[in-house]
Amino acid sequence: MKIFVNGTFDILHRGHLEMLRYAKGLGDYLLVAIDSDRRVTELKGPTRPVNNEIDRQFFIKSLKWVDDCWIFNSEEELVHIIETIKPDIMVKGSDYQGKPIVGEQYCKEIRFYEHTGHSTTKTIHRIANR
């Protein structure tokens, strides 16, 4: 079974790792797509990302649970990736429950992962306020 996850994965933290481990446990192949630098800046502001897309992709591909990882520049590219791989399950954070999910029409099932309270934005604020 193919499992799909997408996200920014800017400063990798325990919450990311726990979600990716959970996702891998659902199937045979874990496929991940990460937002490009341009997209992260558009979504999160001019000071982001902290880590560039090549480094973020390297970090994600280095994880034992991840079988492949792509970078996408737009919602249209993300839909194309999802449509092409046709994942059996897409894993999203629980904050996406009740909201439209990009590419969901190309997945057999959506699973929601309950966040542990970790976040890159919280980490950045904590560091900045020291």
Where are the regions a protein language model picked out?
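Nucleotidyltransferase catalytic core that binds NTPs
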Residues: 1-130
